[in-house]
């Protein structure tokens, strides 16, 4: 279900993700999980780096279901970009 980047940074356009928001002046206006200060890209980078969902959840204090939803969005977007 989820894709791990193979030596490459996963680039995601979070603008259509329902659980991500951009708040000017909050975390420098980067995409964050709604209601948090956790950067969406940080979750993906941790996963791409080999961290399991349970570990990411514990480290960031975000429910595993939310982590999976975020990673699923990123994977679907990446699959649309693949030739």
Report each predicted region and the residues it spans.
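Long, charge-rich, low-complexity alpha-helical segments
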Residues: 36-83
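Short, Lys/Arg-enriched anionic-surface-contact patches
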Residues: 17-38, 81-82
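Acyl-CoA thioester-binding alpha/beta core of soluble enzymes
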Residues: 14-21, 54, 75-76
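Hydrophobic packing positions characteristic
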Residues: 1-15
